[in-house]
Curated annotation (Swiss-Prot):
The keyword Ligase does not apply. Residues 68-130 are cytoplasmic. The chain crosses the membrane at residues 45-67. It comes from Oryctolagus cuniculus. This is Potassium voltage-gated channel subfamily E member 1. InterPro entries: K_chnl_KCNE (IPR000369), KCNE1 (IPR005424).
Length: 130
């Protein structure tokens, strides 16, 4: 003799199969879409949301722990030490100031004495020939 199954899945499947065999057309598809207890899928949606929530929480935890381990692992990297030291900014600033001073040495201002002495005088312009 076969011991009884405590989950009772087989009788549910057999009754569902018998019901769908008797029905035809669109009523069979609507029965297949309906939940087994007729609760319109409220518990199924809750289950899916719980699974997605656990998955998201687990994934977020892994991501944050990985990011933290990468920060701790690379904190003594020479590149990061160089960036944090701000030596490069001071060198850049000194180089930029030297370039500005070098370019200013070549700068000079031409002064038009006629325009300074007689600012009301009209200066003639050349008209382009056609």
């Amino acid at each position: 003799m076969i011991p009884p199954n405590a989950t009772a899945v087989m009788p549910f499947l057999t009754t569902l199969g018998e019901e769908t065999a008797h029905l035809q057309g669109s009523s069979a598809t609507s029965l297949a879409r309906r939940g087994p207890l007729g609760d319109d899928g409220q518990m199924e949606a809750l289950y899916i949301l719980m699974v997605l929530g656990f998955f998201g929480f687990f994934t977020l935890g892994i991501m944050l722990s990985y990011i933290r381990s990468q920060k701790l692992e690379h904190s003594h990297d020479p590149f990061n030490v160089y960036i944090e030291a701000n030596d490069w900014q001071e060198k850049d600033r000194a180089y930029f100031q030297a370039r500005v001073l070098e370019s200013c040495r070549g700068c000079y201002v031409l002064e038009n004495q006629l325009a300074v002495e007689h600012p009301d005088t009209h200066l003639p312009e050349l008209k382009p020939s056609l």
